[in-house]
A protein has these predicted regions:
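N-terminal carbohydrate-binding accessory modules
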Residues: 1-68
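A cross-domain feature marking catalytic cores of carbohydrate-active enzymes
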Residues: 6-10, 73-77, 108-112
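Short, solvent-exposed loop/turn and secondary-structure capping segments
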Residues: 15-19, 83-84, 117-119
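Residue-level signature of transmembrane alpha-helix interfaces in integral membrane proteins
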Residues: 23-26, 119, 125
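Residue-identity detector for glutamine
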Residues: 29-32, 102, 117, 133-135
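A short alpha-helix capping/helix-coil boundary motif
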Residues: 37-40, 73-76, 127-128
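An active-site-proximal structural segment forming one wall of the substrate-binding cleft
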Residues: 44-71, 81-112, 122-158
C-alpha cells in the first residue's frame, strides 16, 4: 500500500509556530511555560476546548475523501495525565475510532519526553534538553511507549 500521510501536529502536543492553540494567545513559548502562566482551571478548559475543536471527525472524513490514508499523531509523554498535565487518551482513542471509520491508518509519534528531547517548543521546554541525563526519565519514556503499544497494538487503524 502506498502511504499518503499528513501530520496532525499542534493538536495533542502544542506547537506555537503552527498557530491556533492556547499558546498563540500566551506570552510563553512552550507548554511548560503555559502551565506556569495560566491558572490551573483556565489551562484545563483552554486545552480541552482546543483538543475538542482543533481536529475533529470531520477532518478525518475530509482527509479520506482527498486520498490521505495515514495520519501521524504527535502525542506527549504525559498522554495518561500527570499532576501538571491533562490526559489526552480520550482524544487519541477518538482519533483511532475516526480513522477506522474512514479507512485511515494511524501512526503514533511520541513527540515529547520529560525535560525535552530537543530543546524546541515541541518538546515542551524551550532551550532545555535534559531527558537523556537521567535513567529514571528514560525508563519512564520506555514505560509510556510500552503502554501505548499495549493499548493500540490490536487496533485495526494501527
Amino acid at each position: 500500500m502506498k502511504l499518503r500521510g499528513v501530520n496532525l501536529g499542534n493538536w495533542l502536543v502544542l506547537e506555537k509556530w503552527m498557530g491556533a492553540s492556547p499558546l498563540s494567545v500566551a506570552t510563553c513559548e512552550d507548554e511548560r511555560g503555559l502551565i506556569d502562566e495560566m491558572p490551573s482551571g483556565e489551562l484545563e478548559l483552554a486545552l480541552e476546548m482546543h483538543r475538542r475543536s482543533y481536529i475533529t471527525e470531520k477532518d478525518f472524513a475530509w482527509l479520506a475523501r482527498v486520498g490521505v490514508n495515514l495520519v501521524r499523531i504527535p502525542v506527549p509523554y504525559f498522554i495518561w495525565g500527570t499532576a501538571n498535565h491533562l490526559s489526552c487518551t480520550e482524544h487519541l482513542d477518538n482519533a483511532f475510532a475516526w480513522a477506522e471509520r474512514q479507512g485511515l491508518k494511524v501512526l503514533i509519534d511520541l513527540h515529547t519526553v520529560p525535560l525535552s528531547q530537543n530543546g524546541f517548543d515541541n518538546g515542551g521546554y524551550l532551550a532545555l534538553c535534559a531527558w537523556a541525563q537521567d535513567q529514571a526519565r528514560i525508563d519512564y519514556v520506555v514505560d509510556v511507549l510500552e503502554a501505548l503499544a499495549r493499548r493500540y497494538a490490536g487496533h485495526p487503524a494501527l
